[in-house]
């Protein structure tokens, strides 16, 4: 049995990252390991996922958790990237350095690496991965990025941990959004690019119009209330407020259940 400390963007309101956490927990369940996770909200991860959380920005608590662990495990996500902020790379590199200073194992699983546009981001990411004891990426592009920034090892390739989520139980009382025989398409959007999502809004506003005119009902899915809300609202307004939205979901399981009522998903 090992004591594992997980690290990622967990318990911060992003249901995609939480899907990775929950998938990893489901995959490793029954193996006898003691697990804690660094997270944005310890109460949230305990109530939703049944795992003890450590405040991710309280480095005194983080240090004590590392002292008590056997390995620091990164279950996945695109956390080594500088497209949103270089602080993400700096934070996760610091965790790796703290773990190795204490003689702990560091395991990178299902990593989506990049974009890494700045020299500092590339340098810190290369250092972090070269310090790791095992590296697994979730796509060939991430493997190529690691090679380009100076990673000296040979990463393994594996699926995203979210694929370890169990199939949801279909609930008959969940609402359907299709009307008059229309099929339903779930749409997940994120603000992206230097224009703060303007191109995303324009593209998906047009997409929703095309779908509706061709007999499909588009439904906007809020995966991260802090990041997605404004983009979803703008897409809805561009269509006269007529695009259904799914908001305030509490866990990846809630997302899965809603998706059982859909015919397709575009992200």
Predicted regions and their residues:
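Active-site anion-handling motifs in enzyme catalytic cores
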Residues: 1-267
């Amino acid at each position: 049995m090992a004591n594992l400390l997980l690290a990622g963007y967990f318990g911060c309101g992003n249901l995609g990252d939480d899907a990775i956490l929950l998938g990893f927990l489901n995959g490793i369940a029954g193996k006898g390991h003691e697990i804690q996770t660094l997270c944005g909200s310890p109460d949230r991860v305990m109530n939703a996922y049944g795992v003890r959380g450590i405040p991710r920005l309280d480095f005194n608590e983080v240090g004590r958790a590392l002292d008590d662990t056997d390995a620091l495990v990164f279950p996945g996500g695109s956390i080594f990237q500088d497209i949103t902020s270089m602080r993400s790379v700096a934070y996760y590199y610091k965790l790796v350095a703290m773990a190795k200073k204490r003689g702990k194992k560091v395991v990178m699983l299902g990593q989506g690496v990049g974009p890494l546009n700045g020299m500092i981001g590339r340098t810190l990411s290369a250092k972090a991965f070269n310090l790791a004891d095992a590296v697994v990426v979730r796509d060939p592009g991430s493997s190529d990025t690691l090679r380009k920034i100076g990673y000296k090892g040979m990463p393994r390739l594996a699926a995203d941990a979210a694929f370890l989520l169990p199939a949801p139980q279909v609930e008959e009382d969940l609402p359907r959004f299709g009307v008059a025989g229309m099929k339903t398409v779930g749409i997940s959007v994120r603000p992206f690019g230097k224009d703060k999502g303007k191109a995303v809004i324009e593209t998906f506003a047009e997409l929703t119009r095309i779908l509706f005119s061709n007999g499909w009902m588009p439904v906007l899915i809020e995966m991260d209330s802090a990041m997605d809300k404004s983009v979803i609202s703008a897409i809805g307004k561009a269509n006269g407020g007529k695009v259904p939205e799914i908001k305030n979901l509490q866990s990846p399981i809630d997302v899965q259940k809603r998706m059982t009522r859909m015919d397709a998903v575009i992200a």
